[in-house]
Each structure stands twice: as C-alpha cells, then as structure tokens.
C-alpha cells in the first residue's frame, strides 16, 4: 500500500475509533464521561502528532457534517458551538500541543495536551454557565481528573506496546 493511501486509511480508522470511544458514555451533569480521550491519545500516540491531528480533524468534520460521532450518538454544528463544544475544539488543540511536544516524549506531550483540552473546555463552558472559576473547575475538571488520568496512562501503555505494529 502506498504511503499516502496508508496514511488516509489509518487516519480514517482512528477517526472511527474516536467516534466509537465517544459512544461509550456516562452522563455526569452537563458533561458526559466518555472514552473519547482514550481514542484521542491512542490516535496521537500511535499515529504521531501530524497524522493524529488529521484523525481528530476528520472526526470533528464528520461530526460537524451531522454524522452521529459525538457522545450520545449526536452530531451537527450545534455540538461544536454548544456548552461542551470547547472540549471538542480542545481535542484539536490537544492534538496540536501533542504534535509540538512529542519530541519531549509521549507521556509529557499527552499530559500537556490533556491540560490544554481542560483549559479550552473550561473557558468555553464559562461563556455559557453561571459561576466563577471554582464552580467551573468543580463541574468540568474535578470529576474527570482520575478517569482521564487512567485513560491517558492506558493510552500511553497501549501506545508503547502497539507502536511497532501500526507504523
């Protein structure tokens, strides 16, 4: 398979993986707990920053076009501009952060990407919700810290074990 064909197939498959991970969802207030970030970090860790960002962009474009790829089998532009849209945009910024920092190691790049995703999501959520910084952090970050750390570490471990089989 030609390299460009292989890249297109891998990016598309990982965009699908992110969607499947998004469908595994448990509502927690305004924000659902999903395995989306596991899919994001597997994409970045296994494909690298550039191709991982492409997979994330494909995922977001499919959702924007109305495909039900987001949590709760939802899609459409409304999801990208809704109350949790900042987290969706944060996935792309997370990918770009990973891409910029991957030369320092996968785990530090993943952690930095997760922090950027939180930042983007919290700023966006603040524009929609009442309350100050602490209220936003209690709603958008605190309940997700431990599960997100576990997903990030699982993605890191899987990336280390599977990398030689993907690229």
Label each region the model flagged.
Residues 22-35, 60-94:
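Interfacial aromatic-anchored transmembrane helix boundaries in multi-pass membrane proteins
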Residues 50-51, 85, 135:
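Residue-level recognition of membrane-helix boundary sites in multi-pass small-molecule transporters
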Residues 73, 103-167:
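Membrane-embedded alpha-helical hairpins and interfacial helices in multi-pass inner-membrane proteins
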């Amino acid at each position: 398979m030609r390299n460009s064909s292989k890249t297109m197939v891998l990016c598309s498959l990982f965009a699908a993986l992110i969607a499947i991970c998004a469908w595994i969802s448990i509502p927690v207030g305004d924000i659902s707990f999903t395995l989306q970030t596991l899919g994001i970090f597997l994409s970045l860790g296994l494909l690298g920053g550039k191709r991982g960002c492409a997979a994330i962009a494909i995922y977001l474009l499919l959702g924007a076009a109305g495909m039900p790829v987001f949590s709760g089998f939802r899609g459409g532009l409304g999801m990208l501009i809704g109350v949790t849209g900042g987290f969706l945009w944060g996935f792309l910024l997370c990918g770009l952060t990973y891409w910029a920092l991957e030369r320092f190691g996968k785990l530090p790049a993943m952690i930095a990407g997760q922090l950027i995703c939180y930042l983007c999501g919290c700023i966006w959520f603040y524009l929609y919700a009442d309350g100050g910084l602490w209220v936003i952090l209690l709603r958008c970050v605190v309940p997700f810290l431990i599960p997100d750390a576990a997903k990030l570490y699982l993605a890191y471990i899987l990336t280390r074990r599977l990398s030689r089989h993907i690229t």
